[in-house]
């Protein structure tokens, strides 16, 4: 293979990018409304509910662990 045949695909990679221009081009950043405009209340409720559940479970487990520690070490 000739060296020029090997360099041809590389020259496309090194060429500056051509940006499309014209009135038909739209920016992808303005296609939708910002996510904070209308919160998804189902996701918000699910997230807060899960957080509360995990904290309650963590505190309950911690209290059980403390009681088990005291029982094993004769502190109770």
From Swiss-Prot:
Key word Electron transport present: yes
Listed GO biological process terms: aerobic respiration; mitochondrial electron transport, NADH to ubiquinone; proton motive force-driven mitochondrial ATP synthesis
Single GO term (MF): NADH dehydrogenase (ubiquinone) activity
Compartment(s) where it occurs, according to its Swiss-Prot or TrEMBL record: Mitochondrion inner membrane
Source species, domain of life: Eukaryota
Principal location: mitochondrion
Signal peptide: none
Transit peptide stretch: 1-27
UniProt entry keywords in alphabetical sequence: Electron transport, Membrane, Mitochondrion, Mitochondrion inner membrane, Respiratory chain, Transit peptide, Transmembrane, Transmembrane helix, Transport
Chain ranges passing through the membrane: 41-59
Pfam families: NADH_dh_m_C1
Cellular component annotations (GO), alphabetically ordered: mitochondrial inner membrane; mitochondrion; respiratory chain complex I
Family: Belongs to the complex I NDUFC1 subunit family.
Subunit organization: Complex I is composed of 45 different subunits.
Protein role: Accessory subunit of the mitochondrial membrane respiratory chain NADH dehydrogenase (Complex I), that is believed not to be involved in catalysis. Complex I functions in the transfer of electrons from NADH to the respiratory chain. The immediate electron acceptor for the enzyme is believed to be ubiquinone.
Name this protein carries in UniProt: NADH dehydrogenase [ubiquinone] 1 subunit C1, mitochondrial
């Amino acid at each position: 293979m000739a060296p020029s045949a090997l360099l041809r695909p590389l020259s496309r990679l090194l060429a500056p990018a051509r940006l499309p221009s014209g009135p038909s081009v739209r920016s992808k950043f303005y296609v939708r409304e910002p996510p904070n405009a209308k919160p998804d209340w189902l996701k918000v409720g699910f997230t807060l509910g899960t957080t509360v559940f995990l904290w309650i479970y963590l505190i309950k487990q911690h209290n059980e662990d403390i009681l088990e520690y005291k029982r094993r070490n004769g502190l109770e």
